[in-house]
Regions:
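RNase III-family endoribonuclease catalytic core
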Residues: 1-132
Protein backbone atom coordinates (compact mmCIF):
# COMPACT_ATOMS: atom_id res chain seq x y z
CA UNK A 1 0.00 0.00 0.00
CA UNK A 2 1.15 3.53 -0.77
CA UNK A 3 2.41 5.75 2.02
CA UNK A 4 -0.10 8.57 2.39
CA UNK A 5 1.58 10.29 5.35
CA UNK A 6 2.30 13.45 3.32
CA UNK A 7 -1.37 13.79 2.37
CA UNK A 8 -2.48 12.97 5.91
CA UNK A 9 -0.21 15.73 7.20
CA UNK A 10 -1.75 18.20 4.74
CA UNK A 11 -5.23 17.08 5.79
CA UNK A 12 -4.39 17.26 9.48
CA UNK A 13 -5.88 13.80 9.87
CA UNK A 14 -4.30 10.35 10.19
CA UNK A 15 -6.47 7.51 8.92
CA UNK A 16 -7.03 4.46 11.05
CA UNK A 17 -8.26 2.62 7.95
CA UNK A 18 -5.83 3.52 5.14
CA UNK A 19 -7.95 1.50 2.69
CA UNK A 20 -10.64 4.18 2.93
CA UNK A 21 -8.17 6.85 1.86
CA UNK A 22 -6.86 4.62 -0.91
CA UNK A 23 -10.41 4.10 -2.19
CA UNK A 24 -11.09 7.85 -2.04
CA UNK A 25 -8.09 8.37 -4.31
CA UNK A 26 -9.04 5.66 -6.82
CA UNK A 27 -10.49 7.22 -9.96
CA UNK A 28 -12.84 5.12 -12.08
CA UNK A 29 -10.33 5.13 -14.97
CA UNK A 30 -7.73 3.46 -12.74
CA UNK A 31 -10.26 1.00 -11.37
CA UNK A 32 -11.41 0.06 -14.88
CA UNK A 33 -7.86 -0.29 -16.17
CA UNK A 34 -6.81 -2.49 -13.26
CA UNK A 35 -10.16 -4.33 -13.00
CA UNK A 36 -10.56 -3.40 -9.33
CA UNK A 37 -14.34 -3.22 -9.33
CA UNK A 38 -14.33 -0.25 -6.96
CA UNK A 39 -13.60 3.46 -7.25
CA UNK A 40 -14.20 6.71 -5.38
CA UNK A 41 -17.61 7.57 -6.86
CA UNK A 42 -19.72 6.29 -3.95
CA UNK A 43 -17.49 8.10 -1.46
CA UNK A 44 -17.82 11.23 -3.59
CA UNK A 45 -21.60 10.95 -3.26
CA UNK A 46 -21.37 10.87 0.55
CA UNK A 47 -18.66 13.54 0.67
CA UNK A 48 -20.90 15.97 -1.17
CA UNK A 49 -23.58 15.51 1.51
CA UNK A 50 -21.10 15.75 4.38
CA UNK A 51 -19.67 18.99 2.98
CA UNK A 52 -23.17 20.37 2.47
CA UNK A 53 -24.16 19.51 6.03
CA UNK A 54 -20.99 20.83 7.69
CA UNK A 55 -21.16 24.04 5.66
CA UNK A 56 -24.86 24.51 6.46
CA UNK A 57 -24.22 23.96 10.16
CA UNK A 58 -21.34 26.46 10.12
CA UNK A 59 -23.32 29.11 8.24
CA UNK A 60 -26.35 28.58 10.48
CA UNK A 61 -24.23 29.30 13.55
CA UNK A 62 -22.13 32.14 12.14
CA UNK A 63 -24.70 33.95 9.98
CA UNK A 64 -27.67 34.05 12.34
CA UNK A 65 -29.06 37.18 10.70
CA UNK A 66 -29.36 35.70 7.18
CA UNK A 67 -32.64 34.19 5.96
CA UNK A 68 -32.75 30.62 4.64
CA UNK A 69 -32.61 31.64 0.98
CA UNK A 70 -29.41 33.61 1.49
CA UNK A 71 -27.86 30.77 3.48
CA UNK A 72 -28.67 28.38 0.64
CA UNK A 73 -27.06 30.68 -1.94
CA UNK A 74 -23.97 31.11 0.21
CA UNK A 75 -23.65 27.36 0.78
CA UNK A 76 -23.97 26.78 -2.97
CA UNK A 77 -21.15 29.22 -3.65
CA UNK A 78 -18.94 27.56 -1.04
CA UNK A 79 -19.65 23.93 -1.93
CA UNK A 80 -19.13 23.99 -5.69
CA UNK A 81 -16.61 22.56 -8.13
CA UNK A 82 -14.52 25.74 -8.23
CA UNK A 83 -14.14 25.92 -4.44
CA UNK A 84 -13.44 22.23 -4.04
CA UNK A 85 -10.94 22.37 -6.89
CA UNK A 86 -9.15 25.19 -5.06
CA UNK A 87 -9.04 23.21 -1.81
CA UNK A 88 -7.77 20.15 -3.69
CA UNK A 89 -5.00 22.24 -5.26
CA UNK A 90 -3.97 23.59 -1.85
CA UNK A 91 -3.18 20.07 -0.67
CA UNK A 92 -1.75 18.91 -4.05
CA UNK A 93 -4.44 16.25 -4.23
CA UNK A 94 -3.78 15.60 -7.92
CA UNK A 95 -0.41 14.06 -7.11
CA UNK A 96 -2.10 11.40 -4.95
CA UNK A 97 -5.05 10.39 -7.17
CA UNK A 98 -4.70 7.05 -8.95
CA UNK A 99 -5.70 7.59 -12.57
CA UNK A 100 -5.78 5.34 -15.60
CA UNK A 101 -3.13 5.95 -18.26
CA UNK A 102 -5.52 7.68 -20.64
CA UNK A 103 -6.91 9.99 -17.96
CA UNK A 104 -3.41 10.80 -16.77
CA UNK A 105 -2.20 11.50 -20.32
CA UNK A 106 -5.04 13.96 -20.93
CA UNK A 107 -4.34 16.01 -17.80
CA UNK A 108 -6.75 14.33 -15.41
CA UNK A 109 -4.54 15.05 -12.39
CA UNK A 110 -5.18 18.77 -12.94
CA UNK A 111 -8.78 18.62 -14.18
CA UNK A 112 -11.19 20.53 -11.89
CA UNK A 113 -13.89 17.85 -12.04
CA UNK A 114 -11.45 15.05 -11.14
CA UNK A 115 -9.90 17.01 -8.28
CA UNK A 116 -13.17 18.29 -6.83
CA UNK A 117 -14.72 14.81 -6.98
CA UNK A 118 -11.67 13.28 -5.28
CA UNK A 119 -11.77 15.98 -2.62
CA UNK A 120 -15.38 15.07 -1.83
CA UNK A 121 -14.39 11.40 -1.68
CA UNK A 122 -11.57 12.19 0.77
CA UNK A 123 -14.03 14.12 2.96
CA UNK A 124 -16.29 11.05 3.02
CA UNK A 125 -13.32 8.84 3.88
CA UNK A 126 -12.53 11.09 6.85
CA UNK A 127 -16.20 10.97 7.87
CA UNK A 128 -16.35 7.16 7.77
CA UNK A 129 -12.96 6.74 9.41
CA UNK A 130 -13.40 9.14 12.29
CA UNK A 131 -16.73 10.94 12.15
CA UNK A 132 -17.38 14.65 11.90
Amino acid sequence: MTDYSELEEKLGYVFKNKKLLELALTHSSYSNEHKLGRDNERLEFVGDSVLGFVTAEYLFGKMSDLPEGELTKLRSRLVCEDSLYGFAQLISLGSFIMLGRGELATGGADRPSVLSDAFEAVIAAVFFDGGI
